[in-house]
Amino acid sequence: MRLVVDANVIFSSIIKDSITRRLILFEDLRLFTPEYFYIELEKHIDLIQEKSKLDRNIVELLIDVIMSNIDVVPLDEYIQFVPEAYKIMKDIDEYDTAFLALAMSLKVDGIWSNDPDLSKQNKIKTYTTRELIKKFNI
């Protein structure tokens, strides 16, 4: 299954050893995220470290392991879908535009997000962590 994964799902997998982390490492999932993710990571890295209660070195190691299972896609590969995605997301949550645009460009099976705002759009199916757990019987 091919999914675009949103930043908060990735952050959750870094913060806590959980089912979310196991799903990210699950071989039946091919995951993608926009390069914009790294801007979000940089903004929130201190909070992620604080919530995880781990040393910075361990947090960075976890980021490397988790991101080795996620394809980071540069903006130029989905930029032509940004205007349409923005039209859809501008009144919902414009910060999710990149995730929707990427999903539209890659023609994935859906977007993995626990953010209710992303599920308000009807262009691309959105899966929560709970739905993926049920789907894969994990």
Which residues make up each language-model segment?
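Acidic, PIN/NYN-like endoribonuclease modules and their adjacent C-terminal/linker elements
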Residues: M104-I138
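Alpha-helix capping/helix-boundary segments
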Residues: I10, F37, F99, D117-L118
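PIN-domain endoribonuclease scaffold, especially VapC-family toxins
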Residues: F26-D28, E35-E84
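Short, well-structured N-terminal submotif of metal-dependent ribonuclease cores
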Residues: M1-E35
